[in-house]
Amino acid sequence: MSKVYMMVTITNRNKRKDFRTFFKEHGLPVFLETTGRGTAQSEVLDYFGLEESEKLLFLAIVTGETWKKLRRGLITKMMIDVPGTGVSFIVPLSSVGGRKTLQFLVNEQEFEKEEETAMKDTDYELLVAIANQGYIDTVMDAARAAKAGGGTVIHAKGTGMELAKKYLGVSLVEEKEVILIVTKSREKNLSLIHISEPTRH
């Protein structure tokens, strides 16, 4: 049985090509990327002799085994543990909406589906919906129908979208909207169903 996680990697924007190559070489062709900026105070940057720089954020779905391999490479090859290089971590997922979607996201990683897990002692959970441009209102209307509140939208670019045809039977554009919605744990499954249904058509 395999557990799945969302891997978050944050690094400087000028490292985009290096990290894209690294992920693909390590069997991770499907990921999202977006930009941000650091919030370190200027005196901290001055102390370490650093300049404020734009950040690059990568999001990918990985299995526990894939994370172990990636983590080793991130340290030995990408030097992620060197201060100022970046950070990479994983967040456990309790479920993914749809078998084919899961197959697409984990792609060629070794994976055996296990039962959905309940997050213990949590009143709220974070729903991450990935949609094509122009579908934000569709996703949010569906989420609100399941009693979810507002959401936060991040514009991102998807890599590996050509693999969608293999798993989902449709082509996906690279430009994506990532919608983050905090929902009550007991209403999470209903939100997933509401969001998944209208966005399939």
Where in this protein do the model-derived segments appear?
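A cross-kingdom feature marking solvent-exposed beta-strand/loop segments within repeated
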Residues: 3, 17-54, 71-85, 149-175, ...
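Residue-level detector of conserved catalytic or cofactor/ligand-binding positions
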Residues: 193-201
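Surface-exposed interaction/gating patches
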Residues: 1-16, 110-176, 182-184
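Short, structured active-site "lid" loops
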Residues: 50-66, 173-180
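Short, conserved beta-strand segments within well-ordered enzyme catalytic domains
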Residues: 8, 32, 59
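Intrinsic disorder/low-complexity detector
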Residues: 1-14, 63, 68-72, 76-79, ...
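Predominantly single-stranded RNA-binding modules in RNA-associated proteins
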Residues: 58-59, 66-67, 79, 145, ...
